[in-house]
């Protein structure tokens, strides 16, 4: 799971420290699994004006450039990417800082909290089979597999933002009859290459909106690249991508899909809340650690639709996270979809990463069937209330016994 450090803006009058700003605070998530050395997410207090934020960041940058002595290279780059979610006032920045600068930030009155950045990764595993579309379109299902859905809706008029490794937008799965693509690029916090070097994001996008493998075959998908070709990234990079989505998506007609995760992060969960409050339905993978989803982010965010994985016999997948924060289960074992190595390539893989886009596609499907769009709370209720109950087998350990369902057959 990728977790990048967001660093709040701290003002440094000259080189004077804020020694009397209040009680000494500590960095949250310090030493957490996947912690990235010397990288932090700084979250600023709500209500700060743009000028106050700039004054703070300028002061911290000045302090850092004058006192940073124990770090070299990229680890000591200072104040990096800033973020601001206008829907909630959640704002701050990320960066790499030495110990002295970190303490100056912690002592700054403008700062709400500082969180150590952590690694975020995809939730996928290789395996084999095709059955997911049948499962989510039938209350009771069996081979031969068919997909039943309302073709007049099918995600028309909706956009799903795939926060992942990117999308091969030229893939046949996204091409229309007039030769255009329903897939486009939106944001890239990883590098300067707008391509999917991993395949994971293309696979998820295909399950969401592919013309063969997709739940919502008329939806548009937008690549929000926050993970590298190796399938990992940082919390800071993920939050930056979420910030872009929150500021650019159309409320009540948009879905964010996040098949990734890492250590529990207050910053990442707060970004989920900001997306939700911006009118964007957000669907996330539960995680592949076979543990309580409350321990990881963004699966632990209350405003996310958190999706666990089942296999084709309706049994909870051996790897799937579980617990009361799960909202629904969806197909996540042996899922066939598009792949990024060519415009016709496909691949069968498993993971809660594969379950998540089934439900993201379902969210788009339900939005398109609603006149005038639908807000995240309405779509969350629709997905959980329409789910098939009582069919998940295995030890679900407090998870709701619900399988995502489009209510069609």
Curated annotation (Swiss-Prot):
Inhibited by PMSF, SSI, the peptide Phe-Val and by Phe, but not by EDTA. Its EC number is 3.4.21.-. GO terms for molecular function: serine-type endopeptidase activity. One of its GO terms (cellular component) is extracellular region. Induction: By easily metabolized forms of nitrogen, including ammonia, nitrate and amino acids, and by glucose. Coiled coil: none annotated. Glycans are attached at residues 178, 252. Residues 22-123 form a propeptide. GO terms for biological process: collagen catabolic process; proteolysis. Residues 130-409 form the Peptidase S8 domain. Keywords: Collagen degradation, Glycoprotein, Hydrolase, Protease, Secreted, Serine protease, Signal, Zymogen. PROSITE patterns: SUBTILASE, SUBTILASE_ASP, SUBTILASE_HIS, SUBTILASE_SER. Residues 1-21 form the signal peptide. Gene3D superfamilies: Peptidase S8 propeptide/proteinase inhibitor I9, Peptidase S8/S53 domain. The keyword Signal applies. The active site is at residues 164, 200, 353. It comes from the Eukaryota. Residues 39-122 form the Inhibitor I9 domain. It is found in: Secreted. InterPro entries: PCSK9_ProteinaseK-like (IPR034193), Peptidase_S8/S53_dom (IPR000209), Peptidase_S8/S53_dom_sf (IPR036852), Peptidase_S8_Asp-AS (IPR023827), Peptidase_S8_His-AS (IPR022398), Peptidase_S8_Ser-AS (IPR023828), Peptidase_S8_subtilisin-like (IPR050131), Peptidase_S8_subtilisin-rel (IPR015500). Pfam families: Inhibitor_I9, Peptidase_S8. Belongs to the peptidase S8 family. Hydrolyzes gelatin, casein, the chromogenic substrate azocoll and the cuticle of the nematode P.redivivus. Immobilizes P.redivivus. This is Cuticle-degrading serine protease. It comes from Arthrobotrys oligospora (strain ATCC 24927 / CBS 115.81 / DSM 1491).
